[in-house]
Each structure stands twice: as structure tokens, then as C-alpha cells.
């Protein structure tokens, strides 16, 4: 691989687990790391411990919430980008900062890999004008990228996951042959998070206090999965949807604390009092927090005819393995978090495909010899169930495919292996650095952004006491 001078913006839990590890596999490291001044000690200690010879630059905390970088920071970055001859940048900050850095980097012609969500306006659950910003900011960045011919990649690993690639190939081929769209699709995801009332109000990593939640966290991946699975580019123009209709419901922290009240927490954690937290509840402190769960029915239409009906069931309040009050040091992956993921997709009378992927153990249990991680409950459990109308399309009437069989055996045997999802992230990173990405370009997320915008507009309506229905023309 040709010399890459990589700027890493944000060295948090995700960047350490995905980007530092992924770059090491390629024999690379970031030449420059930028983070908040409040993280200076942690960043320097990590770089020293892992022998990463990166230069560092630390910025004031007030920069993290700006829509555009301050003139001073822009000048500092101009100097650093030139001095280090930066060719590639990875944005792995808290999402509120994404927009400012993207607006700075794209006009410079620096190839960018950004974490999801692409941008993250605050208070999108409560203010219509903020929810609309999701689409406006995306359109602005798309225009910038087009104008400056700057490659921008979004880290959405399911676009690179060989298991989902296998499914999209089946779906795409069938749509092309019969010109029949995906008829029904159901997607379920539960991320296994379980937060105390205090954590909901204080978290900075995957926060809720800024008026956004699940949809900007792991939920983005599954809205994007729905967009990807529709394979709209394979439909003839006259069947391609031109309108989205969405109706939703959401479960907020105040809803959860009504159900999981003070006696509940006292029972499970044996703590004498949660008076402070539940006084905050009575004062309405939790009312404007972001959503924990989101459920929605979506209809994609063409000339008022239904093309596809989709349901989303995206949870942060579902099954978890956490059974302790004091959070673990690693709250990202080792705090009781387990994933349940399923998809059910039907193409008329021709085909039904189901995905089943259910964990019961945590990442920290990967090396436990008592687990077969490819079985139900294991970290890598993933099955594809396929049902075919053989009289029309041929093939096997029923087929069960183990997800692991779609990967080379060497992947799981690699000492650096930490899961197939992460192997897909590695592939995204490698394609980005090689300049060969064509699966998760900024422009590929247009439909995802439409759905995301409509979802938050629906949440706003519900919180304003209105019927949570949104009708939106598709761009």
C-alpha cells in the first residue's frame, strides 16, 4: 500500500477497537491524532502504551459542539495538515463534531472516512427545524464532495459484511430478473445496553441528554440496512418509489423510568435510595432526552401505489447482561452489552430470506472455552434461512446458511480476530485507504438520510401531541 499520512480525529473506545487495530493489521498508524484537551492524559498514555509514534494536537472542549471550526482551530489544522502532508482523515469523534470537521476536510481534497451518523444536530427529538437539519447538512456535504471531487466514506460495516452481501446479491438478481420489488421487510435490533438514570443524564459516549438517541447510535446501521436491502437501483423507473410514508412510536427515558421505578432499582442493585434521580424525573429533566427505542411502519410508494412495506424495531432498552450498578471501565463493549439482530425479507411469492443473530455472552467472553461462538448465544452466531418458490425460480426449497461459512477460514484463526462485524469494518477501512470504495460513499446514504429525517420528524410530532405520521418525497 502506498504511503498514507493519516489524521485520526478522536481516539475514543471505537477508534481504539476498530481503527488503531485495523491500521496495525495493514502496517499503518495515524501520523497525527487530534482530541479534546480534557482527553490529553488518556490519549498520550494510550499512544505510549501501544508504541504508536503519532504526533498529537489537543483542542478546547468548546470546539466539540460547533457546526464550523473556529478560525483559530482552522489555522492550526491548516498548519498541521501541511506539515504532516495529510492524505487521509478518519473522523471518530462524538458525532456532534462530525459536521464541522467534514466541512473543513472536504474542500481540502483530503479523503475522509467518517463514523455514522454523518452529522448529528442536537435536539432532533424536540425541534422540527433541527430534525430537518439532518437532510440539509447531508445535502450541503454532498454538494461540497461533488464540487471538490473529494472521496467521503461512511463507516457502515454491514455494507461490507459478506453475509449481507450474499443476501443483497440474491435479492438484486431476483429483482433484475423479475422486476419485482421487495414486498415486505422487518428489521429488529436490540443492542443490549442498560443504563442507570444517572448515566442517561451524564453519558457522553452514545449520549441521550442532547435530544437524540438510538437512531443516531446503533439504529443508524439498521436504517441503512433497510435502505441497502431494498436494492432500489435494480428496479425499473416506473416501479421505483418516489414517496416515503412513516408512522412511529418511541420509548423515552422518562417512559422507562415510569416502568423501572425506584423500587425496581432498589431491588436489583440493593441501593437504599435513588431519590436524586427520581426527583429529576418529577421535574421533567428526562423529558427532552433522546429516544431509547424506536418502532416504525414505513411504506414506500410510487404514484400512491404501495411498493414496499417495512417495519423497524430498534431497541436500546432490551435484553442485557448487565447486573451491576457501577459501570465497567469499558462502557462501550464490556458493560453487559449483547446484540440481538434479525431480518425478514419477502419478494412477493418468489422468495423469503431471514437473518437470525442472537448473542447471550459479552465481548469479554470471547476466549471462554465453554462457548461455541457460532451457536445461538455466541458472539458470532448468524444464520441465513432461505425459502424459495422452486417452481418459478428453481434452487433449493429451503436452505440454512451459517454466516461463518461465507468468510475465509483464515479470518477467524487470525490472532487479531474480534468478530465478523469487525472484519467487515476492517474491509471498509482498507477500501477507503486504497481508494476503491464503492459501497458506502456519502452519496450512497441518500435514502438512509431521508428515512432518518422522517423518523425524527415523526418523533417531534409525537412529543408535540400530534399524530406521528410523516409523508416525504424521496430525493
Model-assigned labels for residue ranges:
Residues 1-108, 122-139, 474:
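N-terminal glycine-/serine-/threonine-rich beta1-alpha1-beta2 phosphate-ribose binding loop
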Residues 108-111, 147-150, 304:
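A short helix->loop->beta-strand "cap" motif at the edges of active sites that frequently abuts
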Residues 109, 115-118:
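Short helix/strand-capping hinge loops at secondary-structure junctions
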Residues 89-90, 112, 185:
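Receiver (REC) domain switch-region micro-motif
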Residues 199-362, 443-447:
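Rossmann-like dinucleotide-binding domain that binds NAD(P)(H)
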Residues 120-197, 212:
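A contiguous active-site-proximal alpha/beta segment in oxidoreductase catalytic domains
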Residues 329-475:
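C-terminal helical cap and adjacent loop that interface with cofactors, partners, or active-site loops
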Amino acid at each position: 500500500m502506498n504511503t498514507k499520512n493519516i489524521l485520526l480525529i478522536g481516539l475514543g473506545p471505537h477508534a481504539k477497537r476498530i481503527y488503531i487495530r485495523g491500521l496495525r493489521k495493514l502496517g499503518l498508524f495515524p501520523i497525527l491524532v487530534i482530541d479534546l484537551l480534557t482527553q490529553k492524559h488518556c490519549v498520550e498514555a494510550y499512544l505510549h502504551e501501544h508504541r504508536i509514534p503519532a504526533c498529537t494536537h489537543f483542542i478546547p472542549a468548546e470546539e466539540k459542539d460547533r457546526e464550523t471550526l473556529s478560525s483559530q482551530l482552522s489555522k492550526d489544522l491548516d498548519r498541521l495538515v501541511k506539515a504532516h502532508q495529510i492524505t487521509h482523515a478518519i473522523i471518530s469523534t462524538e458525532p456532534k463534531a462530525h459536521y464541522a470537521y467534514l466541512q473543513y476536510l472536504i474542500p481540502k481534497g483530503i479523503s475522509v472516512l467518517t463514523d455514522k451518523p454523518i452529522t448529528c444536530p442536537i435536539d432532533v427529538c424536540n425541534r422540527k427545524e433541527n430534525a430537518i437539519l439532518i437532510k440539509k447538512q447531508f445535502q450541503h456535504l454532498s454538494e461540497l464532495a461533488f464540487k471538490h471531487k473529494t472521496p467521503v466514506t461512511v463507516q457502515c460495516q454491514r455494507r461490507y459484511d459478506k453475509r449481507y452481501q450474499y443476501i443483497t446479491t440474491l435479492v438484486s438478481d431476483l429483482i433484475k430478473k423479475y422486476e419485482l420489488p421487495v414486498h415486505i421487510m422487518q428489521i429488529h435490533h436490540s443492542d443490549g445496553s442498560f443504563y442507570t438514570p444517572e448515566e442517561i443524564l451524564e453519558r457522553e459516549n452514545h449520549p441521550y441528554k442532547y435530544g437524540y438517541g438510538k437512531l443516531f447510535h446503533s439504529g443508524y446501521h439498521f436504517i441503512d440496512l433497510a435502505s441497502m436491502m431494498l436494492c432500489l437501483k435494480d428496479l425499473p423507473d416506473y416501479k421505483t418509489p418516489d414517496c416515503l410514508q412513516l408512522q412511529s412510536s418511541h420509548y423515552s427515558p422518562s417512559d422507562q423510568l415510569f416502568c423501572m421505578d425506584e423500587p425496581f432499582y432498589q431491588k436489583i442493585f440493593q441501593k437504599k435510595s435513588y431519590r436524586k434521580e427520581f426527583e429529576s424525573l418529577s421535574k421533567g429533566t428526562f423529558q427532552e432526552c433522546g429516544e431509547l427505542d424506536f418502532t416504525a411502519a414505513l411504506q414506500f410508494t410510487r404514484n400512491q401505489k404501495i411498493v414496499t412495506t417495512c417495519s423497524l424495531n430498534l431497541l436500546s432498552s432490551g435484553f442485557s447482561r448487565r447486573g451491576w450498578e457501577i459501570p465497567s471501565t469499558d462502557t462501550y463493549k464490556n458493560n453487559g452489552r449483547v446484540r440481538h439482530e434479525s431480518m425478514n425479507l419477502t419478494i412477493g411469492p418468489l422468495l423469503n430470506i431471514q437473518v437470525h443473530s442472537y448473542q447471550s455472552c459479552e465481548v469479554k467472553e470471547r476466549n471462554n472455552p465453554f462457548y461455541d461462538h457460532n451457536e445461538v448465544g455466541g458472539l458470532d452466531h448468524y444464520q441465513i434461512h432461505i425459502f424459495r418458490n422452486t417452481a418459478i425460480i428453481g434452487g433449493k426449497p429451503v436452505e440454512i446458511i451459517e454466516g461463518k461459512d461465507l468468510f475465509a477460514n483464515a479470518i477467524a484463526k487470525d490472532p487479531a480476530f474480534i468478530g465478523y462485524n469487525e472484519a467487515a469494518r476492517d474491509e471498509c477501512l482498507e477500501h477507503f485507504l486504497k481508494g476503491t470504495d464503492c459501497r458506502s460513499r456519502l452519496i450512497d446514504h441518500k435514502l438512509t438520510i431521508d428515512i432518518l429525517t422522517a423518523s425524527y420528524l415523526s418523533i417531534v410530532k409525537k412529543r408535540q401531541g400530534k399524530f406521528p405520521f410523516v409523508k416525504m418525497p424521496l430525493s
